[in-house]
Design a protein with these regions (language model features):
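Active-site-proximal alpha-helix that buttresses catalytic centers in soluble enzyme cores
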Residues: 2-255
Length: 255
């Protein structure tokens, strides 16, 4: 195994940048809304055994024989319809989240670097971890941006970090946030986002509906556990909405 080269250590040198960092990891996005870019992105995404749990040979034939020949062009048109001037909406909003979190921590006196990575596409998890390490970071909190734990999402991020760690000699201290679907801060933020919207636009006549992304039927037991966590998240959010008819405004939507 070949390891990445390590920079020479300078004794007594004080770090000029934060040595603790938060790595926000989102699912991923193509680099641009074109068929070639979608083909690269889908090939990486759909080749992950965490995402598609069927025999590898069978899936390889389906993926390369059918999906990557047909889907990129269709998906590119859909991406183009939502593409922002600053790029992919998912990447743009993830970067904005990172900036808000960095500002929130900085205002409270925490000297912490915050950066973002995509599990599939760019910037990759490995490239961002390389940059953090080169900047002198020695402690990293990895935060997959999925409230409910799931193998194709959260565990796949852990896989990417582990793959980077395998080729790195001097590892930083690594910690992972596994799930936060029932964290009081997260639940409160969800509830206040709904309530803030109601204050501005009025309360709708019909009930609110939560529509999480589905799971493959082949893993129904695993999907049921994810579904239960989704229900708990929404039930606790609804409790706050019902118990606070006139709640105080949320604080600037900070993380």
């Amino acid at each position: 195994m070949t390891f990445l080269p390590e920079p020479p250590h300078v004794h007594g040198a004080a770090p000029s940048s934060p040595t603790t960092a938060v790595l926000l990891c989102n699912l991923g996005t193509p680099d641009e809304p074109t068929a070639p870019a979608l083909r690269r992105y889908l090939a990486e995404f759909l080749s992950d055994p965490r995402v598609v749990e069927i025999p590898r040979l069978l899936w390889w034939l389906i993926l390369h024989g059918i999906i990557l020949r047909v889907r990129p062009k269709k998906s590119a048109a859909k991406y183009a319809s939502i593409w922002l001037p600053e790029g992919s909406p998912l990447k743009a909003w993830t970067v904005k989240q990172g900036r808000l979190l960095a500002g929130y921590l900085g205002q409270r006196g925490h000297r912490v670097a915050v950066d973002c990575a995509m599990r599939y596409g760019s910037p990759s998890v490995a490239s961002v971890l390389d940059a953090m390490k080169a900047a002198g970071v020695t402690r990293v909190l990895v935060l997959p941006l999925y409230p409910q734990y799931s193998g194709p999402t959260t565990a796949s991020v852990v896989d990417a970090v582990a793959a980077w760690a395998q080729r790195t000699r001097a590892l930083p201290e690594l910690r992972f946030v596994n799930r936060y679907h029932d964290d009081p801060g997260y639940i409160g933020a969800l509830a206040h986002s709904v309530l803030d919207h109601w204050r501005t636009h009025g309360r709708p006549d019909r009930p609110c509906a939560a529509a999480p992304r589905g799971s493959p039927s082949a893993g129904m037991a695993r999907a049921q556990r994810l579904d239960n966590r989704m229900h708990r998240t929404w039930a606790r959010t609804a409790q706050i909405r019902c118990s606070e008819p006139n709640p105080k405004p949320s604080r600037a939507h900070a993380p």
